[in-house]
Structures are given as C-alpha cells and as structure tokens.
Regions:
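N-terminal accessory targeting/assembly segments
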Residues: 1-80
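Histidine-anchored nucleotide/phosphate-binding helix
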Residues: 81-91
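Residues at alpha-helix caps and immediate loop-helix transition turns in enzyme cores, especially N-
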Residues: 79-82, 111-112
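Conserved beta-strand/loop subsegment of P-loop NTPase cores
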Residues: 64-71, 93-102, 123-129
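Canonical P-loop GTPase G-domain recognition
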Residues: 105-157
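A conserved segment at the C-terminal end of the G1
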Residues: 159-171
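Residue-level signature of catalytic and energy-coupling elements of molecular machines
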Residues: 29, 90, 144
Length: 171
C-alpha cells in the first residue's frame, strides 16, 4: 500500500497481520496511522485504520466526498439498469453523484435530450463531455476541485481518457 503522509511524502507500507485476522482490508482513501520502518527508503507498516466516513465495495474505496459516474452517450449505448444500480448504491451510502456522459461529439441531439429528461428530473448534476475533443473537461475539473472523488462506470466509456486529460501525469 502507498500511504501519503502530509508534508513527508509517500511511504510504501504493509498492513499488519492483525488486519487479516479481523478480515479488514485497507482501502484507497482510508485514513491510517503508520509506523515508519525505514525513513530513507520510505517504508512502513499500517498499524491502524481510522473510522471510515463511507466505503464502497466497487470501486473499493473509502472516505469519498462524491462519485463521478461516467457513461457513454453512445458506443456503447448506456445500459440504464446498470446506471440506475450505480445511483442506488451511491444513494444508499449517501454519496453525492455527478453524472458524466462522454462521447458528446458522436451523439445525436435526441440522445442527449433523452438523458437530460431522465436524470436531470431526478436532481442529478449532469455533465456532457467529449474526451476526444477535450470539451467539457473544465466543468469536470471545477466539480472535482477540493473533493475526494471516486470515478465509476462500465468499460469503454472513457473514464481513463477523462482522467488522463485531467491529470496527464496519471497515465
């Protein structure tokens, strides 16, 4: 596990055996206490996982402020049942959701209007983007600013493309 310690950097840490015995696994986003084993090599052990504000199983994360749920408008067409399951899961954990629909550059106006009619009326913030043309990315950047955000969605919808535009060093 890589643990970011404010003002000291990133430490490569192992979880103590006590976590395995208690069937607790550290998650991305966990706030933890570590013991430093080797300062020069930035090695340590996770000794305590602090209480979680929230946690998700898929993606396996904890302590998030919001979720950016990404689906394509087309190619692949949105699977509404899957999208609704994402929304129900986030609602059950009281995690605010921003819905991001990618591939606006190849979508038709009726496709966009259908998504607006369904999900805007439910009160979800919607962002329509084209990762290919880097359109709408600044809106996402503003919505993410200062928040710990989980990004979720099915394969092939452009999650990695959006992340790579937002943070090229993440590639």
């Amino acid at each position: 596990y890589y643990v970011h310690v404010v003002e000291f950097g990133v430490y490569e840490c192992k979880a103590k055996g006590v976590f395995r015995k208690e069937k607790i696994k550290p998650l991305v986003g966990d706030n933890v206490e570590i013991e430093i084993l080797d300062e020069s090599e930035k090695k340590g052990n996770i000794v305590k996982i602090l209480p979680r504000q929230n946690e998700l199983i898929r993606p396996a994360v904890a302590n998030i402020d919001q979720a950016l749920v990404v689906f394509a408008i087309t190619k692949p067409n949105p699977h509404f049942n899957l999208l609704d399951r994402f929304l129900v899961m986030m609602e059950s954990k009281e995690i605010p959701v921003v819905l991001c629909f990618n591939k606006e550059d190849i979508a038709t106006n009726p496709q966009v209007k259908e998504l607006e009619a369904i999900y805007e009326s439910c009160g979800y913030p919607l962002v329509f983007v084209s990762a290919k043309e880097e359109r709408g990315i600044e809106t996402i950047r503003e919505l993410l600013k200062g928040k710990t955000t989980a990004i979720a969605g099915p394969s092939g919808v452009g999650k990695s493309s959006i992340i790579n535009i937002l943070q090229p060093e993440a590639d």
